[in-house]
Amino acid sequence: MIKVDGLPYWRLSGFYFLFFLTIGCFMPYWSLYLKSLGMNAEAIGILSAIIVVTKIFSSFIWGWIVDYTGKRMHVIRYTSFFSLFSFCFVLFFQDFWSLFIILLIFSIFWSAALPQVEATTLSHLGEESDRYTTVRIWGSISFIIAVVALGNFFDYYPINYLLPIVIFSMALVWIHSLFIPEVSSSYQKSDNSTFKAILFKPR
């Protein structure tokens, strides 16, 4: 039995569900969509790797912004919206360089949400961090559902349906983020929240 108490359990687990539902819709089938555009293996590899590569620097930048402002949920909401907004441009462009630029911008915003939601979840859990798995598991469930469901769906329908499905799922992520409460705390932004201070901060 899941004990909710003061934890916004369904709002947090709902975000994981929708976020990984989106990933389950997008990641396994994105290369198939690119192949349908006539792109070769090299182009598909590059356009598929952008999301992974941008995490190297973008997560650090968004983490610094959160540390500086103390507005974690604001960052999650804004980046979720601009992820949706930027990805919509994929509907209008099909050439390599246009998609490269669109995905680069999209990836910078998209990579912000999950690390900050993880931090928000752990902050809400406080000393009950052992309950983290009961929240996070919904992401695993939705990922499996998305992969299996779309695998069967694309046996009967063209891969072009992928884009509206992903966009709809991203819209749900953004809308749901509006209902996750900020962690109430006496958070004070640090005077040392600079790139240099964070980079050389001993762990």
Model regions and ranges:
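Hydrophobic core of transmembrane alpha-helices in multi-pass small-molecule transporters
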Residues: 17, 86-90, 96-114, 120
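Helix-to-loop junctions at the C-terminal end of transmembrane segments
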Residues: 57-71, 154-155
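Structural signature of the two symmetry-related core transmembrane helices
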Residues: 74-89, 167
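Glycine-rich segments within core transmembrane alpha-helices of 12-TM secondary carriers
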Residues: 129-150
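Juxtamembrane intracellular "pre-TM" segments in multi-pass secondary transporters
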Residues: 1-7, 177-203
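Helix-loop boundary and gating motifs at the non-cytosolic
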Residues: 2-55, 203
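Symmetry-related core transmembrane helices of the 12-TM Major Facilitator Superfamily/SLC fold
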Residues: 84, 146, 161-179
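Residue-level signature of mid-helix packing/kink "hotspots" within the transmembrane helices
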Residues: 52-60, 143-144, 148
